UniProtKB/Swiss-Prot annotation:
Record GO terms (molecular function): phosphorelay response regulator activity; protein-glutamate methylesterase activity; protein-glutamine glutaminase activity
Role according to the record: Involved in chemotaxis. Part of a chemotaxis signal transduction system that modulates chemotaxis in response to various stimuli. Catalyzes the demethylation of specific methylglutamate residues introduced into the chemoreceptors (methyl-accepting chemotaxis proteins or MCP) by CheR. Also mediates the irreversible deamidation of specific glutamine residues to glutamic acid.
Enzyme Commission no: 3.1.1.61, 3.5.1.44
Protein name per its UniProtKB record: Protein-glutamate methylesterase/protein-glutamine glutaminase 1
SUPFAM superfamilies: CheY-like (SSF52172), Methylesterase CheB, C-terminal domain (SSF52738)
Gene: cheB1
PTM per Swiss-Prot/TrEMBL: Phosphorylated by CheA. Phosphorylation of the N-terminal regulatory domain activates the methylesterase activity.
Family label: Belongs to the CheB family.
Source organism (scientific name): Rhizobium johnstonii (strain DSM 114642 / LMG 32736 / 3841)
Leader sequence segment: none
Amino acid sequence: MSAPARVLVVDDSATMRGLITAVLSSDPEVNVIGQAGDALEAREAIKRLNPDVLTLDIEMPNMNGLDFLEKIMTLRPMPVIMVSTMTHRGAEATLAALEIGAFDCVGKPAPGELRPFGDLAEKVKAAARTQRQYSQPVVAVAPPPSVADFRVGRKIVAIGSSTGGVEALIAVLQKFPANCPPTVITQHMPPTFTKSFAERLNRLCAPVVQEATDGARLEIGKIYLAPGGERHLQVSGASAPCCRLIDRAPVNGHRPSVDVLFDSVAELAGRNAVGVILTGMGRDGAAGLLKMRHAGARTLGQNEKTCVVYGMPRVAHELGAVEQQLPLSAIGEEILKMTAARKEGTE
């Protein structure tokens, strides 16, 4: 049995520090070794205690969590899980933190409600196990134009991701031209965060990126991100494919679930689809990707070396759902090769 993950909890609220500590301490594989109320205390505690993982509040006095995270990633890179308020402002800051190099994020619960912290211990343990090489922040690059040598076919692209997915999706989607194939995405994220993430992707990428709405028609040049929260994203409509937001219990512990999306794409599009599974904890999406492959779709998985967490892609690969495993840098271009029209009137 491996040693428990050693965690330092950083939050300016004593109540929140106590709550996070209590949640984490209920797991025997996690050891909270200290607490800090601001960046100065945290810096000294990191030197003294040498934690495996940090939980870090976004909003703190003196130096906010985002500025402190940048210093950590420069001076002492380590896995950091951001703890943020469930607001638009909190979501924007958290997305920036994930691009800087934070491992993952959780939303602060409302009074008397602990659900956002339900998987915190699992995220901490995954963070402690990761061999990730912490890197420089994602740099926005000029997106590719709509180019004459890319003619989109009739395929739908479906992508699933979780931990590490913010950076991974940016890397993939920045390869897409403005006339990309219709693309649907489920990324595990807290409610309110997905709208901000869609807006951020829309600024960084050539296609139109939007949070999916029920009934939104799938169109060339548009990317649809499943909203976090209470419903799953599916696609339906043989003659006019569109997004559907479905009320249903969580699948694999997630809502929205990648498996639910992939299952619907397999049923609707069959061989006229490409399925992609990116970095993430657990197994969500693996069975759905296998269903897509059995239906004739092309399928890709992110390789172990470039994953923040090689969980979802690993299970998919072991099931035989993945046609090709590729480094993150190659996935966007491969999707375009698989979806381009070969000649007039073909896919």
